[in-house]
A protein has these predicted regions:
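Zn2+-dependent cytidine deaminase-like catalytic core
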Residues: 32-133, 217, 262
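Short beta-strand scaffold segments in enzyme catalytic cores
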Residues: 27-36, 156-157
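Active-site ligand-binding patch in enzyme domains
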Residues: 143-144, 149, 153-278
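Short, basic/aromatic recognition patches
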Residues: 3-23, 144
């Protein structure tokens, strides 16, 4: 079990290399081990591209060793055709004798089907290795699948005496180091949301300027569409969702999502954003 945990931790390290690029898919890493030596490894690099198991197997130089090897992967191999072929089939085709898994995939298209397919074809399967750590690693994915909503992150800065800004005014209170950290976090999440007053006071850009990576989608709550249209969030530089009670539709990169005033606000916002395939939001 100790060796299983060692190799699973390597899967975690690899999986994290895909953060910010694989949503709505989970972060997955895989290693191929032969006689207690890693002979291949890979991770899911980008949504729509090959999965971790495919990349790990492809990296093995001597394919003859695969039939005597164990593959470690932090999520149950898929068993369905999506944007890529099923990974469980690839493991079977290469006659890999054992597959060690961290978490079962709760996506209804898999949901134990990958494990069953492997076992039915003579592959030994061990699951549940570092299960809790794996759940935390892919907490966004598991929240999406189980609760049908984005994973929500609350971010705020405050002064030592407990204030977040002068009354009615905006402005930075965090330092340059924290600016870099905040922008790094933005690259890893699907969207960032602010309210009416934040747009008025701060005129934020809600993009990534102090770090290298993708811009998140912007989400703005503008109840009756009264925000000035010269604000940065409406500059069409990135996809922006405008939550409101007036209209639906799209104007260039600005997407209007109409809410129902009779329904609970938070619940319908999360449902609407989930429908837009937003899996995590700050």
């Amino acid at each position: 079990m100790q060796d299983h945990e060692k190799y699973m931790r390597r899967c975690f390290d690899l999986a994290l290399m895909g953060r910010g690029n694989v949503s709505p898919n989970p972060k997955v890493g895989a290693v191929v081990v032969h006689q207690d030596k890693i002979i291949g490894e890979g991770y899911h690099k980008k949504y729509g591209q090959s999965h971790a198991e495919v990349n790990a197997i492809a990296s093995v130089e001597n394919k003859n060793l695969l039939k005597e090897s164990t593959i470690y992967v932090n999520l149950e191999p898929c068993c369905h055709w999506g944007k890529t072929p099923p990974c469980a089939n690839l493991i079977i085709e290469n006659k890999i004798k054992r597959c060690v898994i961290c978490n079962k995939d709760i996506n209804p298209k898999v949901f134990g089907g990958g494990i069953k397919l492997l076992q039915d074809n003579g592959v030994e399967v061990i699951s549940g290795v570092l299960e809790e750590e794996g759940l935390y690693l892919n907490r966004r994915f598991f929240t999406n699948q189980s609760q049908k909503r984005p994973y929500v992150i609350l971010k705020f800065a405050q002064t030592l005496d407990g204030f977040i800004s002068p009354e009615g005014k905006g402005g930075w209170i965090s330092n340059d180091t924290m600016k870099v950290w905040v922008h790094k976090q933005r690259t890893e999440e699907d969207a960032i949301m602010v309210g009416y007053n934040t747009v008025l006071a701060d005129n934020p850009q809600l993009n990534v300027r102090h770090y290298s990576g993708r811009n998140p989608k912007r989400v703005v709550y503008d109840k009756y569409l009264t925000l000035p249209k010269d604000k940065n969030v409406f500059d069409n530089s990135q996809e922006t969702y405008i939550l409101n009670y007036v209209k639906e539709g799209r104007e260039e990169n600005n997407i209007f999502i109409k809410l129902n005033e009779e329904l609970p606000f938070a619940k319908q916002v999360l449902e609407k954003l989930y429908e837009q395939k937003i899996c995590s939001i700050v």
